[in-house]
Amino acid sequence: MINTDELTVDHFFDPSSKNFIDDPKPTIEKLVKEYPIARFNAWSAWLVTGNKNITDCLLDRRLSTDFNLWEHAPPKKELEDMDAFEKLMNNNLFFLNRSNHLRLRKLALPAFSPRIMEQMKVRFTKLVKERFDEIGKPERFNFATEIAEIIPTQAIASLVGIPRDKFPIFDSLAYGVVRGINPMLTPEERADAIAGVPAGLDLLNELIDEKRKNPSDDFLSTLITAEEDGEKLSNWEMCALIGAVLGAGSDTAGDWQSYLIRALLSHPDQLAELKK
């Protein structure tokens, strides 16, 4: 029997604290060196750090990201009893069993081809230029809120083919996807976070239905026409794939961009090299 009291990190790990937000490196280094696998009771979860440990966990067939496989998990709801957010998570790549995960990945792979990504590179560059034009030339501005929190979601919206005037609806969907799985939210906070998910899913389903009627050479049309062993993606599966892209590519990209700027400002020699 493992004594989890000796493996807990609650006494020093608080990802919401100002100290951690200002400089997470010392805490992360302590986790990696002293607590590579440890219990974090605040999340009712185990934390795994270090590339090898993480890789070993991901490859270990005894472990799964499917919460419903846990022996103490409550009975899974029937689809008709799920709310919009629960239906979205029901098909999310992050929580599927191995066989379904591989099936969806194989079907989705053509939509991420180099040809389509090259098309998107042009759109992404245009989005960034337009954003800087909107900001203008102030003496100072907040990169995190003005760029990092906006561009990644807009880039994914552009990838999916969301009309520019519908970006706010898609942004609310992205916010719900990222915030809705946060284990530290209260039920009230979670309900507020996912409030925009139904409208966002309605928008996606309308767009998917339109693309089914009038396909073109783009990301969403490629998802629709993808076929493997006679199977195609359903609307819910496509919505879940887009949700997975949002979960993996909006919040994380925003954090990465902010840390990149922080690192450059902390290393003037590297910033000078970049300016060359």
Please describe what each predicted stretch is:
Residues 1-276:
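Cytochrome P450
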